[in-house]
Design a protein with these regions (language model features):
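…; additionally, a secondary subgroup of soluble metalloenzymes is captured
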Residues: 1-453, 462-612, 616-840
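Beta1/beta-strand and adjacent pyrophosphate-binding region of the FAD-binding site
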Residues: 456
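Ligand-binding pocket scaffold of soluble enzyme catalytic domains
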Residues: 459
Length: 840
């Protein structure tokens, strides 16, 4: 006998005899293994009495008559006799029995009763090794029922952190390979594989002949599909588990867990191939697929359906009341939908462009101006967003037809209407209509400011890009942003646009086409700084890229002592103006938005500057398709003319169909200039050798001439912000069905002071064990009305018996910090839930 075991027995006995009151402990040592050691045991506060098959009456007299006060260890080196042969049975009933075998000691330690002990005895080898035994003990089960002990043994062998059947199930699935399953083999070594399959039936309702892991995987996915799709092929019916609530809870937990997501994806792909699921589900109405999240092919089928509808120009198409943009937004947040986020973004924006197929332009320039900066600029933004997504596709060829349709509608139904309308009644007087003018920018936006003002001029940032920047800046709780439009100069190109933004009393273009500000040149940074400092001595000009590389102290020095600082940013035009990178111009737009927003935050935080104005010298036109010869206007200008694809400046106007002219004196508000600018009245270009053709500017269109002006004011210190909250709308007191739908509401719209977040919502028991599937809620809605922020969640409960006397809870956690944000107690009143069949 090992010393460890001997000491353990002595400690156990002494612990028992240390209790208050008299203690009689009967020890039936079946094989007499401890007969030679028992007398030497250093028992405290107890006597040792040897029981023999023939001294039962003598023992009874001793214990009950001769010495009724002392504690006794009654040791018998033989098995306990049957009741009818045991004259000490009545004494044993009010005494304690002691067992010294390892299982008995373990049961004594943990308080395991007879039924749990029987399970341990059957699988004694599992806890026969110290590491496994310690793992089993560490689970600290609340109750040692047969099911609980069996589950703990499964988890012990599978090396799970907790004793939940779902943990063992997940480990079995994760360990599976085409050739073997080490975890299941390990269970089989201890004859626990049959226990595992038994629990698959009792916990999940998985019962098939000759069960194996492949069939189990199929059952899990078929059961999930049957729940969301409602109708499944007959061949799949035998695999539908009888307890879908438990299956859904397990599948959601694995799918949404960052640690197991990749394994879930691999399992889903394998089952999808085995079932030929894509072909089977393709035969179902698409309405049935919109809530299915467990197989990647569902998103393929839905994006395919959307593509077909858009190619047919069916913008009224809907599934279950959701139109294509709504469906794209929701599906892009699902598990497999996130992997197709680019496709969904492309399709959502394609829908908006296709919806413009019947675009009607206002009648004249002034109405185009008003409608453009309020609404129509969004079409240009959506066109840009379409190509931003399209260019990220791994296999864009699948969407060639849709891309061609988008391109055709944008060019022939939108640009071909809005630009001619813009050039109808284009202002001919020096005031250029009633619009705010770019040439008055400094006097109206900068000159009157008492605080330091930083002006960021982003080359070619057209109005819709400025609107995106304004939206991004507005998300900062410390900023206030106001976006307004200004009418740029014509021709809408860099030299003239940059000049118009500087302080001046007179702007001029010489016969050699040089632009002067109050007789001063202004083509480069040094010249522009000289012009600016002439009006504001405490001012300066700097390139954006130079600021980016500066350390904090150097950056602060740029602004110290300055009243006005002009920062020149060149991301969009730098990419668009080069033939080999012009198709990257839309990507450059997003980069420009992000880096300008970041720079504003950096300057505000490091240079004690709180007022910023962001604007542009001009906008641009971009079309992806290759220009046809019919889109090009013959260049009849003399060689001395200033010729660009979108304008020609010369002493005389160009007399060509589709070309209009405007005196530069009108543009510059001067009476002395004798030059004339000629420009296409549509999206056409002049024939010019070399250079790119898709990205152009300089002409007369809303896209080229309406420039954004963002007035941004940052606040010192921190502004209090809150995270959006989740509110239960449905009246919830009792759950009476294994499948329940509840209405929730995001309590406030997302704003500069209310941050978005993600919630995980499910039901738990009083021990915090999850009893339902888990819903992932991305709370990012900006709708002002409560109805726009409401949504419905479906919960499927585990198929088991619920006690309507015990508390259960609906809980929600903020996924970013795991803080519980909602707990609502409910009564689970589901009659015989464990027996529900839920046939499919």
């Amino acid at each position: 006998m090992s010393e460890l075991k001997y000491n353990q027995i002595v400690d156990k006995l002494n612990t028992e005899f240390a209790s208050e009151g008299r203690r009689l402990v009967f020890w039936y040592d079946d094989n007499g293994y401890f007969a030679d050691d028992v007398d030497a045991m250093p028992l405290q506060n107890a006597k040792i009495w040897h029981l023999t098959p023939t001294n039962q009456f003598r023992t009874k007299i001793l214990l009950e008559r001769e010495d009724p006060q002392s504690n006794y260890l009654i040791y018998a080196p033989f098995p306990k006799p049957p009741v009818e042969q045991n004259h000490l049975e009545d004494t044993i009933l009010y005494s304690k029995q002691f067992h010294a075998d390892p299982i008995s000691l373990l049961c004594s330690d943990l308080g395991i009763g007879a039924e749990g002990k029987a399970v341990l005895q059957k699988y004694a080898k599992v806890v026969g090794e110290q590491t496994r035994k310690q793992r089993f003990c560490d689970y600290k089960l609340a109750a040692y029922t047969v099911d609980a002990v069996e589950t703990a043994l499964l988890c012990t062998v599978c090396k799970c952190r907790t004793a939940q059947f779902e943990d063992a199930l997940r480990e079995i699935l994760l360990a599976d390979t085409p050739d073997a399953n080490p975890k299941l083999d390990e269970l089989a070594k201890y004859k626990l594989d049959e226990v595992f399959w038994k629990h698959c039936e009792t916990e999940l309702g998985f019962a098939v002949p000759a069960p194996n892991v492949d069939k189990l995987k199929i059952s899990l996915f078929v059961t999930s599909l049957a729940h969301s799709v409602k109708v499944i092929p007959d061949a799949w019916q035998p695999f539908a588990a009888a307890k879908p609530g438990s299956v859904l809870a397990f599948m959601d937990g694995m799918m949404n867990n960052v640690n197991y997501g990749d394994a879930f994806d691999a399992m889903a792909a394998a089952v999808q191939d085995t079932l030929h699921a894509k072909a089977a589900l393709a035969k179902l109405p698409h309405d049935l697929l919109t809530d299915c999240e467990c197989l990647p092919c569902v998103d393929d089928l839905l994006t395919g359906w959307m593509t077909e509808r858009l190619q047919a120009e069916d913008v009224t198409a809907a599934l279950n009341g959701e139109n294509i943009p709504e469906l794209c937004q929701r599906r892009a947040k699902t598990h497999f939908g996130r992997k197709l986020a680019v496709q969904y973004a492309m399709l959502e924006n394609a829908w908006h462009i296709v919806s413009a197929a019947h675009y009607r332009a206002p009648a004249d320039y002034e109405h185009v101006w008003a409608q453009y900066y309020r609404e129509d600029y969004k079409i240009d933004a959506q066109y840009r967003a379409f190509y931003t997504a399209y260019d990220k596709l791994d296999e864009p060829a699948a969407y060639d037809k849709l891309q061609g349709l988008v391109e055709n509608i944008y060019n022939t139904e939108y640009l071909a209407k809005i630009i001619p309308a813009w050039n109808t009644d284009f202002p001919q007087e020096p005031g250029m209509g009633r619009m705010a003018l770019q040439r008055n920018f400094f006097s109206e936006c900068v000159a009157g400011n008492k605080e330091r003002t930083v002006v960021i001029i982003s080359d070619a940032m057209r109005y819709e890009v400025g609107a995106e920047l304004a939206a991004l800046l507005a998300e900062d709780p410390k900023s206030t942003v106001q976006l307004t439009p200004r009418l740029g100069v014509l021709p809408s190109y860099t030299r003239l646009g940059m000049a118009a933004l500087l302080p001046h009393t007179r702007m001029e273009m010489t016969p050699e086409y040089q632009v002067l500000i109050d007789d001063m040149p202004c083509e480069n940074l040094a010249q522009r700084q000289a012009v600016l400092q002439k009006r504001v001595p405490q001012s300066g000009c700097i390139q954006f890229d130079d600021l980016k590389s500066m350390k904090k102290d150097d950056l602060r020095a740029v602004f110290t002592g300055k009243q006005v600082v002009y920062i020149y940013h060149n991301q969009i035009d730098a990419r668009g103006d080069k033939p080999n990178t012009e198709d990257e111009v839309f990507a450059a737009c997003r980069e420009a938005v992000e880096e300008i927003a970041a720079m504003i935050r950096r300057i505000a935080g490091s240079a004690n500057t709180l007022h910023f104005i962001v604007t542009a010298d001009h906008g641009f036109l971009y079309k992806r398709h290759t220009l046809a010869e019919s889109d090009k206007i013959p260049n009849t200008a003399p060689k001395t003319a200033f010729v660009n694809r979108r304008f020609i400046v010369d002493a005389d106007p160009i007399a060509q169909p589709g070309v209009a002219s405007l005196p530069m004196a009108t543009v510059l508000n001067t009476k002395t200039n004798t030059l004339t600018v000629s420009y296409p009245t549509a999206a056409n270009v002049f024939k010019v050798a070399g250079g790119g053709e898709n990205y152009v500017h300089g002409g007369s269109s809303p896209q080229e001439m309406i420039v954004p002006v963002l007035d941004v004011r940052m606040e010192k210190g921190r502004m209090e912000t809150t995270t959006v909250q989740l509110t239960l709308v449905s009246i919830l007191k009792k759950i009476t069905n294994l499948i329940t739908a509840l209405d929730f509401m995001q309590n406030e719209p997302i704003s500069d002071t209310v941050r978005e977040t993600t919630f995980r919502v499910h039901f738990v028991g009083e021990d915090n064990e999850r009893i339902s599937n888990e819903n992932i809620v991305v709370a990012d809605k900006r709708g002002e009305t409560a109805a726009e922020r409401m949504f419905r969640l479906r919960f499927s409960f585990k198929n088991r018996k619920y006690d309507n006397k015990k508390p259960y809870y609906l809980v929600a956690y903020d996924d970013k910090n795991s803080v519980e944000v909602l707990r609502r107690q409910v009564v689970m009143d589901i009659a015989m839930a464990d027996d529900f069949g839920f046939g499919f």
